[in-house]
């Protein structure tokens, strides 16, 4: 690409030199004509009207200039032809790439013109200016205050399981510390707790039913009561009555024996 641009620059310089030489030749011819016009009138005018020699000279000069240009072009071509290795080293490009390169070079040449550069500078300089509209600063609020909902921390399932186990253990400890017992028979296993003489939920189901009907006696005990004794307790109402009678009779006989003892001692006196 660089060699191609250098060749174009050399051709442009040669063309400029040829145009300068032609202009110089025209200036010389005009000076000769002005000098001949200043001669006295004694000379014949016909000799000056014969332009055949001048035309021949001009043709010879033009031929010489063209031959010199051809020689210079041949020299430049020889210079480029003497270096074939540079182009051989370059990779061969397809036709499409060559056409694209030519199109790019044309675009670059067109852009390098002063008119395009002026247009580009004008477009770059003229930028639209937008006036800023005054806006109130936004108040910084948390999302929780806007939504009105609290963000609760996520608790893992393991932590929840551990918390439930701790609550169970605490409940079991409280149950073991305070175990409800029946105030009459002392049992702690009953399907339902009933109201007794001490207060609500102080008697077991069996004792509470008998207390409500008015048949709760000290001799009555359920069979599964921890304080049950066959000698002095029973869970049947008939046997409870028999035990009460025997107990009352025993108490009466005891009282009678105590009363008869002081009479015997008094008879001796």
Curated annotation (Swiss-Prot):
PROSITE patterns: GATA_ZN_FINGER_1, GATA_ZN_FINGER_2
Positions occupied by motif Nuclear localization signal: 136-143
Any one cellular-component term (Gene Ontology): nucleolus
Induction: In leaves, less expressed in dark than in light.
ZnF locations on chain (GATA-type): 176-230
Tissue specificity: Mostly expressed in roots. Also expressed in stems, flowers and leaves.
Alphabetical list of InterPro entries matching this protein: GATA_TF, TF_GATA_pln, Znf_GATA, Znf_NHR/GATA
GO terms under biological process: circadian rhythm; positive regulation of DNA-templated transcription
Region named Disordered: 245-269
Similarity section: Belongs to the type IV zinc-finger family. Class A subfamily.
PANTHER family: GATA TRANSCRIPTION FACTOR, GATA TRANSCRIPTION FACTOR 3
Summary of the function given for this chain in its UniProt record: Transcriptional activator that specifically binds 5'-GATA-3' or 5'-GAT-3' motifs within gene promoters. May be involved in the regulation of some light-responsive genes.
Protein name: GATA transcription factor 3
């Amino acid at each position: 690409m660089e060699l191609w641009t250098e060749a174009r620059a050399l051709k442009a310089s040669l063309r400029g030199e040829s145009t300068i030489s032609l202009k110089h030749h025209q200036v010389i011819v005009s000076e000769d004509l002005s000098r001949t016009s200043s001669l006295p009138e004694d000379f014949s005018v016909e000799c000056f009207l014969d332009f055949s020699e001048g035309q021949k000279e001009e043709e010879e000069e033009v031929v010489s200039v063209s031959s010199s240009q051809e020689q210079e072009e041949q020299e430049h071509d020889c210079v480029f032809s003497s270096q074939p290795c540079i182009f051989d080293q370059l990779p061969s490009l397809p036709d499409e790439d060559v056409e694209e390169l030519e199109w790019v070079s044309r675009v670059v040449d067109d852009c390098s013109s002063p008119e395009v550069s002026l247009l580009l500078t004008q477009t770059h300089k003229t930028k639209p200016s937008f006036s800023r509209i005054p806006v109130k600063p936004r108040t910084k609020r948390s999302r929780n205050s806007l939504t009105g909902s609290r963000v609760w921390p996520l608790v893992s399932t393991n932590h929840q399981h551990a918390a439930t186990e701790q609550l169970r253990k605490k409940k079991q400890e409280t149950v073991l510390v305070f175990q409800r017992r029946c105030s009459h028979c002392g049992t702690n296993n009953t399907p339902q707790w009933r109201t007794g003489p001490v207060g609500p939920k102080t008697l077991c189901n069996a004792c509470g039913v008998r207390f409500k009907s008015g048949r709760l006696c000290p001799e009555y005990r359920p069979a599964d009561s921890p304080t049950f004794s066959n000698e002095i307790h029973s869970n049947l109402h008939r046997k409870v009555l028999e035990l009460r009678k025997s107990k009352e009779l025993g108490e009466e006989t005891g009282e009678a024996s105590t009363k008869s003892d002081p009479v015997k001692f008094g008879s001796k006196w």
